[in-house]
Regions:
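Short loop/edge segments at beta-strand edges and connector loops
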Residues: 73, 125-127
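Long, positively charged amphipathic alpha-helical accessory segments at protein N-termini or as interdomain linkers
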Residues: 23, 99, 106-123, 137-233
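Structural motif
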Residues: 133-134
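A generic structural signal for well-ordered coil/turn residues at beta-strand boundaries
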Residues: 3, 43, 84, 127, ...
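N-terminal lobe of the biotin/lipoate ligase/transferase fold
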Residues: 1-103
């Protein structure tokens, strides 16, 4: 088992969540914090740009302001995504113990597959970094790797997100035949705490994390406060 902590941040501003992802990676990779699984939701609809994405290509800026959508840049690579307030974002930061990048994606995404299975949803891993249910994307992930450590974070779609086609440029809504939510798979709403518990239990059983309830350290809090604004676009 891997000594680690679990943090549920609840609903937070988009830039705060992105800063926490980055700061936790810094602290874990420097040995000041244990391996960490943390989850959060965003307090407003958000466009999350991959590390190298161009917002002028991916985003319909003319509709952002009227829709009340924030834009942030995350520490990981990958495509531009839309996240609504109902989605749950997971982020795991740990030593890179995996034989390959492909294996790390598969094993961590399998945790999400297991979590969804415990809720009654038949899902499967789609390489390199997606989880599908009913042939549609229900979770997508991205990674950041450095200094022998990795951060993998991703979304779990809990409720339908009708704004996605209005906000993202059509060319970027591809690669899978649409998205699906937990609600659409089950025909009912699943409380957030139930989904979070399922995610936590799957990381214990599938990845061997010995999770203890925790919180951000004082150093992490201070760093997040200082750096949050830098993640806005």
């Amino acid at each position: 088992m891997i000594e680690s902590r679990f943090i549920d941040l609840g609903s937070v501003p988009p830039e705060y969540g992105s800063a926490v992802d980055a700061i936790i990676f810094d602290e874990v990779s420097e040995g000041r914090s244990p391996a960490t699984l943390h989850v959060y939701s965003r307090d407003r609809s958000t466009i999350s740009l991959g590390r190298f994405r161009d917002p002028d290509i991916d985003v319909k800026r003319d509709v952002l302001e009227s829709a009340g959508v924030s834009v942030i840049r995350r520490v990981s690579g990958g495509s531009t995504i839309f996240t609504g307030t109902s989605q749950i974002i997971y982020s795991v930061t740990m030593e890179d113990i995996f034989p390959s990048k492909k294996d790390s994606y598969q094993r961590i995404c399998d945790c999400i597959v297991t979590a969804l299975g415990s809720l009654g949803i038949e899902a499967g891993y789609k390489p390199p970094n997606d989880v599908l249910a009913d042939g549609k994307k229900i979770s997508g992930s991205a990674q950041y790797r450095a200094k022998g450590f990795l951060l993998q974070h991703g979304t779990v779609i809990v409720e339908p997100e009708p704004l996605i086609d209005e906000i993202l440029s059509p060319v970027k809504n591809r690669g899978y035949p649409g998205t699906v939510s937990i609600y659409e798979c089950l025909g009912r709403t699943v409380p957030r705490n139930i989904v979070v518990d399922a995610i936590m239990e799957s990381f214990i059983s599938k990845l061997g994390l010995d999770l203890e309830d925790g919180m951000l350290s004082d150093r992490e809090h201070d760093s997040v406060r200082l750096r949050s604004e830098s993640f806005k676009v």
